[in-house]
Amino acid sequence: MDDWFFSFVIFVIAFFLYFHVQNQYKTSDILEIYEYDYTDNKSIQDTCALKQPVLFHMPDHGIVANEIPSIMSTLFIKDIREYYKPDTTVVEPIVLKTSSGIGLLSSDTRSSYFSQNNIIQSENSEKFETLDKKLQPFLNAKTYYDVLFGSRKAYTPLTYHMYSHRFFVVEGNTPNCGIRIKMCPWKNTPRLNQHKDYENFEFWSNMNLFRGDEEKFKVLDFVVNPGYILYVPPYWWYSFQFLDQSSCVTSISYSTAINVLANAKEHALYMYNQPNLQSNIMREIIPEINDVTTNDTPDEHLEDPLPEVDEHETPPEENQDVSLQLIEDLKKSQ
């Protein structure tokens, strides 16, 4: 009798885990965005379970441009043109001090540079805690904060995520300085030339939805104004454009315990592809040790060489490019 009961319990647990893990891989192919009036946390979780993009109004909850220096000491900046070069598999960021990075973005006349995957000092702003209370799912295991912004009309590569929830909180200085976003469902993946960069845990496509490639398949194309929050479901491709230099997007991503289990293979490949596996293990297990280490040697990351500029992509008068000149000056000054 005891053996039968024990086997039954094991079966129920296994079935429960299998059902919820499979739900993490569930996708929707309906090309629609849902508009929602926020009421409480449970209601938003039920809506997000439909695996559709959701847009709702929640003003004054995201980071604005003038708050960036208080929560980030350095910026990771990328050149969108790097993603569309032949044979590109990894796009490394330029690491600059916050003031230098903001100066670069403000002088960029080519709409090429944007900042993402930054190290956020969330304790310096109460907004992250407030957003967690309103958006965090049940049994959340890990939270990832980021703030994304760029030069005017710059855009991010076409990408997707595997977190259980990802919210983009849009803010800006004027009512019309939000983001323009283009999305398409997972069923288009075979036509998108997918790239998996496990070193940076970035999954992207070299299809450019802001330069004509969106005509090859149906996409959602809409604008998110300041004061709104967009929920992007896992395995939905998306790329967004900053409509103004003051456009600022607070990204909050949640991984529940089941989501971590479902993506264990991907996280293992991420750890395996790190240049220094031992130090990254220490970062995950004992983050306090990593904080001390990074504070002692901040300049090591600030002196990384800049990516070479492709002469075929820039006109002969490239030496007059204000943004490129500024990068060189900023790096020398550091």
Regions found by a protein language model. Name each.
Residues 1-229, 239-334:
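N-terminal accessory scaffold of Fe(II)-dependent oxygenases
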